[in-house]
Amino acid sequence: MSGMATTSPVDGEGIRLAKRVAAQAGVSRRDAELLIENGAVRVDGVQQTLPQSRVLPHQRVEIEAGVKPQPVEPVTLLLYKPAGMPIDTAHELLVAANHHEPERAGRRFLPAHARGQRCMTPLETGASGLVAFTQEWRVERKLHEDAAFLEHEVMVDVAGPVSPEVLARLERSPARVSIGRQAEEQTGLRFALKGARPGQIAHICDGVNLRILAMRRIRIGRVPLAGLQPGQWRYLAPHERF
């Protein structure tokens, strides 16, 4: 359909996009909705992914060739949660603008990928680092059933030096602890802890009178934080397993 106008309809004007796509493509209303949800439809050159959005008669609707009307596959997203962000608001970062290296992802981001995501590996508000969100039942089951066996690698900066005696006491905790760097002002510790829970490392440090300055999770099981920056996310790759 011709027409270059970009005026958006107000509530109640025009028709539902799914109805327009169904008529234009000669498919069922459900298949039209699936085409839209899969990012195959543009209105006046702009991708639309909400079947209930409305279009006016003069607006140009384009349907990408070759896209099959099938349900959007569930995905797992890996987020670098910034320090200071509560875990119950971290899902707000799962938007296209924060996608790390989308050109290498092998798939296009769809709003459906961010809906219904469940956080399976929470972090304290003050901590930063890797958090896993998933829509996939197999991943959810793995992270739930094997939670006690999955090793979390966490980098922890503490105030001041850490003496050999304190390090020995840390090593008697459930975690494997080593010193990454040490200076008079602060020490960088590496914790490797299976079944880590929010607050557990802080409790271990409190027990030996160490004051935490920063804490960052860099690995869950076999999945690393990799090249993410705070606030960025990426897809769990097909070959990756926790």
Where in the sequence are the language-model features?
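Basic, flexible Lys/Arg- and Gly-enriched helix-loop patches that mediate nucleic-acid binding at interfaces
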Residues: 5-242
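Short, charge-rich, low-complexity alpha-helical interaction segments
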Residues: 1-2
